[in-house]
């Protein structure tokens, strides 16, 4: 997985961006190299399209070769250049061509950005009672 950082997301939400015909992109040669020779399955970038060519040749090549991509990615300046594990939470699609997803980078412990969950900072309180599904109420209970 490769994310291309251009800092384009730092200019959001300026309405002038929608009128621009050129923006940072990933060239078709770069896409073919990354997917064909480096064998990545997925890449992401900050602008809302892969490239600013008149026919969006990079985007067309990706879609015709079965590759997925993340568009409109933000905060890449806060992720390390290498060594992060990326978790992608996909939305439930209902017939559309795309949708919003949240990308979370699990970074090395010494990374200066983000949050750290300490041993006493678990998101939920501990309980001696186990959760189980209650048929009558239709939900999990303790």
Language model feature labels by segment:
Residues 1-142:
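Active-/binding-site microenvironments in catalytic and ligand-binding cores
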